[in-house]
Swiss-Prot record:
One of its GO terms (molecular function) is ATP binding. Pathway: Cell wall biogenesis; peptidoglycan biosynthesis. Cell wall formation. One of its GO terms (cellular component) is cytoplasm. It catalyses: UDP-N-acetyl-alpha-D-muramate + L-alanine + ATP = UDP-N-acetyl-alpha-D-muramoyl-L-alanine + ADP + phosphate + H(+). It comes from Caulobacter sp. (strain K31). It comes from the Bacteria. This is UDP-N-acetylmuramate--L-alanine ligase. InterPro entries: Mur-like_cat_sf (IPR036565), Mur_ligase_C (IPR004101), Mur_ligase_C_dom_sf (IPR036615), Mur_ligase_cen (IPR013221), Mur_ligase_N (IPR000713), MurCDEF_pg_biosynth (IPR050061), UDP-N-AcMur_Ala_ligase_MurC (IPR005758). Pfam families: Mur_ligase, Mur_ligase_C, Mur_ligase_M. Its EC number is 6.3.2.8. Gene3D superfamilies: Mur ligase, C-terminal domain, Mur-like, catalytic domain, NAD(P)-binding Rossmann-like Domain. Belongs to the MurCDEF family.
């Protein structure tokens, strides 16, 4: 039973979440439940997230209906919720406070010192790593993440310490509502232009994100990324801690080695004033150059927050990873199956580079493009980001509610891959055809990585059993 304490100084009815099963919404709902709010919410269908929240005491409605908000004190919604949603309409009619997801997260952050992790890619993993190092340092943070942290079995945790660590989502600009003590910027790419309009606007958004921190805070920024390095030149009134592999970085990672068990590396801290600090032979059970950079960001922050070297070393060595981030779902007939959320060309290239580093055989990529607009805007990049895969299997586009766009589909991506020189790019006729296709392509020692933000994750968990059945 959750021990409730009074979160506000007066009686408050249930807080209603529209789309409570979403990964971002469910984390905030869980934190609010655990600190004493009465929480309810609706979603289109039941899920592991709604079931978990129901067990914690939330009232869950399946489907959307105006009657669900009867008696609610406020409504929390995300940009995915349409204005004509019946619960939104009812909330407006009742003049209830309509609170955006990021605004509610900002309310939770206001009560503690906070670390907000931003960047086009790597936010979820970096958030999890910061949490792991603060846990190892006995700081016991509260955490709200955009993915399931394997060590917690959930994407949120209420800690007893002074710090809260959150993932800051830039996709709709709402991360600018998060006034954090510490900010992290992992990288900046031209993504979510449907909201921002131009890449210049994206870059200005990240500048504002950093400038939202107080004078006593700091931002950890990856100057290996050219746009982040350019951003540092525009920040004049906030303290920056730079990190990366480049010699100019204040927190520099080097001697990176990859293997089947993960990564090993050194980190040298060269503060502008003070002594050099060397963390030698750090080990992490997660592969990929991009994940080493994410770990370097976490070390930079943990060190500033007072976590000692032994705790940093132990926290990295024991890092349990994040669901859907290079997650092994099984091994069938010697073929390793990996599930990954990567759905942007930069992410896909990084994941495949990691796969190449740990695989003793071929790397076979199965990709489900996510959104027609993303594929249209980045068709050239998608056509050239699979070089580390021996075979690329392309599924139909996961629409995410978008209408089809002429000339933007599975077959055009396969054609683009071939034009850019890929030697083996195949179209997947249907999900049902995947097991037989993988059985024909893969042999013992190969690694199959399924990539995408849609329902391809379900295929990755079914595939090991399907391959074993075919082998009988």
């Amino acid at each position: 039973m959750i021990q409730r304490r009074r979160p506000v100084p007066f009686e408050l009815g249930p807080v209603h979440f529209i789309g409570i099963g979403g990964i971002g919404m469910s984390g905030i709902a869980e934190i609010m439940l655990r600190i004493g709010y009465t929480v309810q919410g609706s979603d289109a269908k039941a899920s592991a997230n709604t079931e978990r929240l129901e067990k914690l005491g939330a009232r869950i409605f399946i489907g959307h209906d105006a009657a669900h908000v009867e008696g609610a004190s406020a409504i929390v919604y995300s940009t995915a919720v349409k204005a004509d949603n019946p619960e939104m309409v009812a909330g407006r009619d009742k003049r209830l406070p309509l609170v955006r997801r990021a605004e509610m997260l900002a309310e939770l952050m206001r009560l503690q010192f906070s670390v907000a992790v931003g960047g086009t890619h790597g936010k979820t993993t970096t958030t999890s790593m910061v949490a792991a190092l603060l846990d190892a340092g006995a700081l016991d943070p509260t955490v709200v993440n955009g993915g399931i942290i394997n060590a917690y079995g959930t994407n949120a945790k209420v800690g007893e310490g002074d710090w809260i660590v959150v993932e800051a989502d830039e996709s709709d600009g709402s991360f600018l509502k998060l006034k954090s003590t510490v900010a992290i910027v992992t990288n900046i790419d031209a993504e979510h232009l449907d909201h921002w309009g131009t890449f210049d606007a994206v870059k200005k958004g990240f500048q504002d994100f950093i400038e939202n921190i107080p004078f006593y805070g700091f931002a950890a920024v990856c100057t290996d990324h050219p746009e982040v390095q350019a951003l540092t030149a525009r920040i004049e009134n906030r303290r920056l801690v730079t990190y990366g592999t480049n010699p100019q970085a204040e927190v520099r990672v080097s001697n990176i080695q990859m293997g089947p068990e993960g990564a090993q590396f050194d980190i040298l801290v060269s503060p502008l004033s003070g002594d050099l600090v060397l963390y030698e032979g750090l080990k992490m059970p997660m592969a990929g150059h991009h994940n080493v950079l994410n770990a370097t960001a976490a070390v930079a922050v943990a060190r500033e927050l007072g976590v000692d070297a032994d705790a940093i070393r132990a926290g990295l060595a024991g890092f349990g990873g994040v669901k859907r981030r290079f997650t092994t779902t099984g091994v069938a007939n010697g073929v390793r199956i990996v599930d990954d959320y990567g759905h942007h060309p930069v992410e896909i290239a990084a994941v495949l580079k990691a796969a190449r580093a740990v695989s003793t055989g071929k790397v076979i990529a199965v990709v489900q493009p996510h959104r027609f607009t993303r594929l249209r805007d980045l068709m050239t990049e998608f056509s050239s980001c699979f070089n580390d895969a021996d075979t690329v299997i392309v599924a139909d586009v996961y629409t995410a509610g978008e209408a089809p766009i002429e000339g933007v589909d599975r077959d055009h991506l396969v054609e683009g891959l071939k034009k850019f020189g890929h030697r083996r790019a195949l179209a997947l006729e249907s999900p049902a055809a995947l097991p037989a296709l993988i059985a024909a392509e893969a042999q013992s020692g190969d690694l199959v990585v399924l990539l995408g933000a849609g329902d391809i994750t379900n295929w990755s968990y079914a595939l090991p059993g399907q391959l074993e059945a075919l082998a009988k």
